[in-house]
């Protein structure tokens, strides 16, 4: 089988509305978030934003009741691969669901580097809610 080229890989992630990100943090400096075009579009991030401002922007747009969980998730990534789904307040679309998967990558310096991808998760959340509802209805019908 032939290997996928970079264009194939990019097309795959565009089709899945999945964007890449990298977070860098080190003592005494602001945390930096680096994003690709898909992630910028997914989060409504202006193109000319610095990595430091980008991290602040995304954190401010996470649904208020889920910010603490988001920061817990970021801490979790420092020790092992993990995934989270959270609500995000997009400046144009309104509230959307985001699925985030990431992990820490090795570093020879004291910097913490996390990498991963974001994906809009509205369809996944909708499917799971429907599944729960169907199971509840099935249980109710079995009790009749």
Kindly give the residue locations of the regions a language model identified.
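Hydrophobic pocket-lining residues within nucleotide cofactor-binding pockets
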Residues: 25, 105, 121
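PAS-family sensory domains
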Residues: 43-117
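Short, charged amphipathic alpha-helical "coupling" segments at sensory-output junctions
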Residues: 1-9, 133-140
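Functionally constrained cores in energy, signaling, and assembly domains
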Residues: 12, 22, 32, 94, ...
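Sensory coupling linkers of modular signal transduction proteins
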Residues: 112-143
